[in-house]
From Swiss-Prot:
Residues 26-89 bind DNA. This is SOSS complex subunit B2. One of its GO terms (molecular function) is DNA binding. Its main location: nucleus. Component of the SOSS complex, a multiprotein complex that functions downstream of the MRN complex to promote DNA repair and G2/M checkpoint. In the SOSS complex, acts as a sensor of single-stranded DNA that binds to single-stranded DNA, in particular to polypyrimidines. The SOSS complex associates with DNA lesions and influences diverse endpoints in the cellular DNA damage response including cell-cycle checkpoint activation, recombinational repair and maintenance of genomic stability. Belongs to the SOSS-B family. SOSS-B2 subfamily. The keyword DNA repair applies. It comes from Bos taurus (Bovine). It is found in: Nucleus.
């Protein structure tokens, strides 16, 4: 457990059951959106620092603001097992604050959210309660997010992206970097119109 003013905890040091976590990471991937029975949107995001990667579960509007390449500070988060995998949560009163973009040393390996036999005992003890808490009391996971102007006057977040492409990252280290238009979800297709200078209406005249 570390406090808000303590140095950030490395991902490699995160264990199930830890609370009040202060972690700084870069967002690598945004998972697809799933919906709970009571209508809340949940995204599982792959994040990393120089010691490895982990999955963080982000709820509702905040998840829609996060983009790959964002450098984020999590405060007052907690770690728990979910379906056999170590997962970070914002927690009640937790906060996600964007502090930069792109420039951070990170390593995708090891992935600490991969199933780990050492955590099976803790999973069996806490999985049922964790699932119940996730579905019944989403306030534990919602938290807050800061994606507006920073203290130094630099605009961050969706409102600062304008018409520029946002960073889409490399999903597996082998693929190309795919530009993504701001405000589009990962599961949406961005249509691009290519014009040859002719009026397209003329082609349909009989």
């Amino acid at each position: 457990m570390n406090g808000v003013r303590d140095p950030p905890l490395f991902i490699k040091d995160i264990k199930p059951g830890l609370k009040n976590l202060n972690v700084v990471f870069i967002v690598l991937e945004i998972g697809r959106v799933t919906k709970t029975k009571d209508g809340h949107e949940v995204r599982s995001c792959k994040v990393a620092d120089k010691t490895g990667s982990i999955t963080i579960s982000v709820w509702d509007e905040i998840g829609g603001l996060i983009q790959p390449g964002d450098i984020i500070r999590l405060t007052r988060g907690y770690a728990s097992m979910w379906k056999g995998c170590l997962t970070l949560y914002t927690g009640r009163g937790g906060e996600l604050q964007k502090i930069g973009e792109f420039c951070m040393v990170y390593s995708e390996l090891p992935n600490f959210s991969e199933p780990n036999p050492d955590y099976r005992g803790q999973q069996n003890k806490g999985a049922h309660n964790e699932q119940k808490n996730n579905s019944m009391n989403n306030s534990n996971n919602v938290g807050t997010g800061t994606f507006g102007p920073m203290g130094n006057g630099v605009q961050t977040g969706a409102e600062a992206r304008g018409c520029q492409f946002s960073y889409a990252g490399r999903s597996n280290g082998r693929g190309p970097i795919n530009p993504q238009l701001p405000g589009t979800a990962n599961n949406q297709t961005v249509m691009t119109t290519i014009s040859n200078g002719r009026d397209p209406r003329r082609a349909f005249k009989r």
